């Protein structure tokens, strides 16, 4: 039985969003909104505290998996494997297809568990000299990196995908595989749009190309791909076995909590850098800690919402308006990611806030997970988030030019959300 009125939950969520927009630390903003929402909704101090504790407990599964993913991400980034993958793709596709090479390399690097901001930082020094040589603009290459990153993100073991999989109690690999077609559409749209704007905006100056003084000995491409390939194979093992009705393999269920670190460690040994295990895994953990804290904060506000009657109110409103409940999944992902300017936080909050309501209107758990996850990449790049500024800095782009790129990013994200909605909302 709900103990919190829906209005309190909504007010708490709005307060959290306003605090985030005012540059308050997102973790404190989410906790603050949760406390205020619980009290306004009529809960006692004790009940509010218990709802928040229950909410944070509900995200612990995602927290553990995100921490585990830090092993793989840390090894790929610190060993130079991610950079080697990008270099090889750009080199093989050549100057004539530089935008496709940039988008594809960004997609692959993000798909194996690297955050989009980090992907842009890795790919930018490789892309800038080639882009200047062929005469394409900053806007074009940045869109290629961002669009490719968005496409990779929805099929990656990144926090947003982990959170929606856990929130709807489906396998991580199912969500990753389920978003594959939308991701391919996103990659194609990225290439087309980036090509169309390749002569628009500022050209790259010689002085803006960073000097690449790197004493790190990077692994060969084959060795760099060992960890990603093993991760993909192990994650896909059970879903593929179920699809093909292979009884023996379908009974083998290995959680991402095991798969991602194991893949990373095997990759590390394959690259001959076993002596760097502590250094790389520590770096990976440090990269994941901000996301872990946001997960806990999002769990707090989700706890308040789950103890309210908001889901019932949302379902009633949808039924009264006659709008298909299918649209609630992508729209919630879009709005929450826009409010928080974060794919991960948006996906987490959308799942916790609207998950029950989405299931109540008849949407299957896997469909809901994929649609929220793709919706979360539509307008997650707004200026009140770190990604907006980090991506601009990677290519030395001023704020005015960076703002002009936002509609094109939304076109890419929107193409993936629309594709997912058509497939999982109407075709399946």
Please provide the spans of the model-predicted regions:
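Membrane-core helix-loop-helix motifs of multi-pass transport proteins
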Residues: 128-225, 364, 387-424, 428
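Core transmembrane alpha-helical segments of multi-pass membrane transporters/permeases
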Residues: 28-31, 47, 51-83, 108, ...
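Alpha-helical transmembrane segments of multi-pass membrane proteins
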Residues: 96-109, 134-154, 175-180, 184, ...
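Hydrophobic alpha-helical transmembrane segments of multi-pass integral membrane proteins
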Residues: 67-68, 92-126, 296-298, 321-363, ...
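Membrane-interfacial loop-to-helix junctions in multi-pass transporters
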Residues: 3-7, 57-62, 89-104, 133-141, ...
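Re-entrant/interfacial helical elements at transmembrane boundaries that shape
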Residues: 71, 84-86, 117-130, 158-168, ...
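Short helix-coil transition sites and intra-membrane helix breaks within transmembrane domains
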Residues: 22-26, 60-62, 73-83, 110-122, ...
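Long, contiguous bundles of hydrophobic transmembrane helices that form the permeation core
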Residues: 2-9, 13, 36, 40-41, ...
């Amino acid at each position: 039985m709900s103990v919190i009125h829906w209005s309190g939950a909504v007010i708490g969520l709005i307060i959290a969003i306003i605090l985030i927009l005012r540059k308050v630390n997102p973790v404190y903003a989410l906790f603050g909104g949760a406390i205020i929402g619980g009290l306004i909704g009529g809960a006692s101090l004790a009940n509010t505290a218990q709802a928040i504790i229950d909410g944070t407990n509900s995200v612990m599964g995602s927290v553990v998996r995100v921490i585990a993913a830090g092993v793989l991400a840390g090894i790929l980034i610190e060993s130079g494997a991610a950079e080697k993958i990008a270099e090889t793709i750009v080199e093989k596709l050549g100057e004539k297809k530089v935008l496709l090479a940039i988008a594809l390399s960004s997609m692959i690097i993000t798909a194996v568990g690297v955050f989009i901001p980090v992907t842009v930082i890795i790919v930018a020094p490789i892309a800038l000299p080639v882009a200047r040589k062929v005469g394409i603009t900053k806007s074009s290459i940045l869109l290629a990196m961002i669009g490719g990153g968005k496409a990779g993100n929805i099929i990656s073991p990144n926090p947003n995908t982990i959170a929606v999989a856990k929130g709807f109690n489906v396998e991580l690999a199912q969500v990753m595989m389920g978003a594959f077609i939308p991701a391919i559409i996103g990659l194609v749209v990225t290439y087309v749009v980036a090509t169309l704007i390749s002569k628009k905006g500022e050209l790259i100056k010689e002085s803006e190309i960073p000097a690449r003084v790197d004493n790190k000995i990077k692994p060969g491409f084959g060795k760099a791909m060992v960890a990603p390939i093993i991760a993909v194979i192990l994650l896909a093992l059970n879903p593929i076995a179920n699809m093909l009705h292979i009884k023996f393999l379908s009974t083998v269920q290995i959680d991402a909590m095991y798969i991602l670190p194991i893949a990373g460690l095997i990759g590390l040994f394959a690259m001959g850098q076993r002596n760097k295990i502590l250094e790389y895994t520590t770096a990976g953990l440090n990269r994941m800690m901000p996301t872990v804290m946001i997960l806990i904060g999002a769990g707090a506000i989700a706890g308040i919402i789950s103890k309210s009657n908001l889901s019932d109110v949302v379902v009633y409103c949808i039924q009264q308006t006659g709008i298909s409940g299918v649209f609630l999944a992508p729209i919630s992902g879009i709005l929450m990611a826009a409010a928080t300017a974060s794919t991960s936080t948006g996906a987490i909050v959308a799942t916790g806030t609207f998950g029950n309501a989405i299931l109540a209107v008849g949407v299957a758990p896997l469909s809901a997970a994929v649609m929220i996850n793709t919706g979360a990449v539509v307008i997650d790049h707004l200026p009140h988030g770190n990604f907006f500024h980090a991506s601009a800095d990677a290519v030395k782009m001023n704020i005015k030019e960076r703002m002009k790129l936002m509609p094109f990013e939304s076109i890419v994200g929107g193409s993936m959300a629309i594709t997912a909605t058509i497939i999982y909302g109407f075709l399946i």
